[in-house]
């Protein structure tokens, strides 16, 4: 079975009027990731969890994130409205460092958090990351899957960038037009496939399988077909409908692919109002976190909202986060 069928995710960005920018993603995985939400303050001392030479930094911005296995940041938004989404990419081929490589190693489990900690906008992140202060080091996930991933970021202006390691080199795709990302193939090929379907037209026919290329086409059509509105509640509802359309139903099986992964959860980020919405596919409610209600001041404790063990939330959950020791990023070994 192709790995992209096992770990299928989708990300979309809605570009509405009057700075109504909304980013959504689905998390599809073959096993329960034990996802919890975390709130990190400014001023946290970090290291890249990739050995003694790992890159080190201090967080400039507070953030609310969704952690996979409480071992890595999969998704999140920082207090400046920058959103980062980590998705699977089977074709990832990471850097093979040279003996005198000046870049510092960074575990793939900390890649998303590095971006949220350090940048306020996509343009700022792209400018700095083109210099490659680090290289990403893969590691196996706690459930034994290869950590082959690519990263999308979006900001309050509607700007987007995609970061992929292909053939041992970092590729960056930077444009407001890059509203959609799924999994395989690599991003330039995803764009080419979508261009073909745009010529056919989404009102004529859309591909309907749960393959990454088909989800890319459907998401691209619908995110631009839904009404453009400055009513943020209408916009969020519409974006939820798009990301649900690209999701994989719970327990679905496909002939020849009996273990295809279902969608575990979805997040929707309201960049303008700094709200992070979360929907577990096993919960009856959508809830959210108003980042403006979180105290991200340096020296404040890390906080956690525990979602495991059947917890159910509704409304703004900012006050329900509890102080907790921060999780440790899954360590990677430089080879």
Task: Identify the residue ranges that each predicted region occupies.
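A short, structured loop/turn motif at beta-sheet edges
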Residues: 78-80, 116-124, 229-235, 271-273
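C-terminus-biased signal that marks the final domain/tail of proteins
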Residues: 7-22, 137-139, 146-147, 156, ...
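Short, surface-exposed beta-strand-loop junctions and turns on beta-sheet-rich folds
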Residues: 29-31, 90-92, 168-170, 282-286
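A contiguous strand-loop segment
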Residues: 8-103, 136, 315, 319-320
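Catalytic cofactor-binding cores of redox enzymes
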Residues: 131-167
């Amino acid at each position: 079975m192709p790995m992209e069928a096992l770990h299928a995710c989708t990300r979309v960005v809605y570009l509405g009027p009057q700075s109504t920018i909304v980013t959504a993603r689905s998390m599809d995985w073959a096993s329960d990731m034990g996802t919890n939400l975390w709130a990190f303050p400014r001023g946290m001392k970090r290291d890249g969890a990739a050995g003694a030479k790992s890159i080190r930094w201090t967080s400039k911005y507070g953030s609310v994130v969704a952690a996979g296995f409480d071992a890595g940041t999969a998704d999140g938004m920082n207090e400046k409205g920058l959103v980062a989404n980590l998705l699977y990419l089977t074709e990832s081929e990471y850097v093979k460092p040279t003996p005198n490589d000046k870049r510092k190693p960074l575990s793939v489990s900390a890649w998303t958090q590095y971006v949220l900690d350090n940048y306020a906008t996509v343009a700022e992140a792209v400018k700095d990351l083109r210099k490659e202060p680090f290289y990403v080091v893969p590691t196996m996930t706690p459930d034994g899957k290869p950590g082959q991933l690519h990263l999308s970021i979006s900001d309050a202006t509607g700007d987007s960038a995609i970061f992929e390691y292909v053939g041992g080199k970092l590729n960056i795709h930077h444009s407001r037009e890059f509203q959609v990302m799924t999994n395989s193939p690599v991003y330039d090929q995803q764009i080419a496939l979508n261009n073909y379907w745009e010529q056919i037209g989404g009102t004529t026919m859309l591909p309907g399988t749960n393959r990454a290329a088909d989800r890319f086409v459907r998401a691209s059509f619908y995110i631009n077909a839904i009404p453009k509105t400055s009513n943020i509640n209408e916009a969020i509802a519409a974006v939820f409908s798009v990301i649900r359309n690209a999701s994989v139903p719970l327990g679905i099986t496909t002939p020849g692919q009996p273990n295809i992964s279902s969608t575990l959860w979805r997040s929707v980020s309201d960049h303008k109002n700094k709200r992070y919405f979360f929907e577990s596919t096993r919960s009856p409610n959508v809830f959210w976190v108003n980042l403006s209600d979180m105290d991200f001041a340096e020296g404040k404790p890390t906080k956690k909202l525990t979602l495991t063990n059947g917890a159910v939330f509704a409304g703004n959950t900012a006050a329900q986060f509890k102080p907790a020791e921060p999780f440790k990023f899954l360590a990677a070994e430089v080879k």
